[in-house]
Amino acid sequence: MIQTFSSTIRRKEMDAVLTCMVDEKTGPGELNTRFIQALKEFTGCDGAVAFRSPSIALSYALKAIDLPAGTAVMLSALAPFWQYDAVEKLGYKPLVLDVEEQTGLVNAQTVQQGISEGGRLLILHESMGILPEIEEIVALGIPVIEDISHSIGAVLPEKSDEAFDGTEKKQGKKQNRRAGSFGIFSILGLEEFDTITGGGGAVLLAPQRRDWIVLKKYTDAASRTDILPDINSVLALVQLKEFNRNEQARKNLFAVFQRALMSGKNRTFVRQPDEGSTIWSFPVVLNGSVKDVKQYASRKEIEIQPAYSDSVISRLQDEQSKDLKISKALFLRTVLFPLYPRLGSETAAKIAKVLGTLP
């Protein structure tokens, strides 16, 4: 059976973790520091801290923002449930937003609606590696915390502007901005099936110096039990170094699978090409019976899984989700097919054939 997920742990990752164990330096230390430095260079952020869980990372972000208790925090209905759970436990009120059908993401219109209902901060989950209308959302003027667990490495071209130097007009250069650089803070999950895994944990990043200065006051006083151990950090470090190689492999597979899917009646989400998005699994929005598709794939020895089985909407009562019609439909109809760098060409061809002949 071809499994839906693989963490793509190769010999390099195994050797790095084994060396960490042999050196008996498994707690937070030098390797955590090296991982953070590499991540800062990769993302261009001003500062970052690696924690033992995404929930802990979020708690420090909200401390730094100084969000009053009871404030409504906006979340996507298709975001991972840990966000909803953490927001409640930290003393805030989750305000769940619907998504747009083509991308599975919240857009500026739904966020504006959330603001009108009292939302004062947005946790923006960039699901499936797709970037939303992020500039339009940030322009609404509320604090945004990006979740780049799927979208790390995605790049949004920035419009070039004309600039003045005091005497003459100059044409500004077009610059690209990476996922994670738009919000006040961003969270990079390192959980088992995140794009970069450390076997658990998360990194809280501050893109701008002014925000890092504030955040650092809190993280400098963090308990050692909040900080990511070296044994996790070294795994994440090697994964980060291998990111470009792995991402190119994922993109090549995605292109093959997407072409195959186009011959049938089902679809995947709309995304920007090339660096405008990154690849996390292969989501398929089914036009027919999920049960029939699952049985068909299983007969071909391919495991598929519901895309949003651990999402916010998966835990809400019917009364709570009655206005989340698009999210509900995508929750029920979207499945994930295997897509990861270790798939061989023969296996990839087998998956592509199934995608092109789905019921």
Task: Locate predicted features.
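Conserved PLP-binding active-site segment in aminotransferase class I/II-type PLP enzymes
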Residues: 1-64, 68, 344-359
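PLP-dependent aminotransferase class I/II
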Residues: 33-37, 42-49, 121-125, 210-359
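Conserved SAM-binding loop
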Residues: 50, 75, 204
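Conserved PLP-anchoring active-site segment centered on the Schiff-base-forming lysine
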Residues: 61-114, 296-297
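Structural detector of well-ordered beta-strand residues that form the stable sheet scaffold
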Residues: 74, 95, 144-147, 187, ...
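A short acidic, amphipathic alpha-helical/loop segment
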Residues: 86, 133-137, 350
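Active-site phosphate-binding strand-loop segment of PLP-dependent enzymes
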Residues: 102-198, 203-205, 210, 336
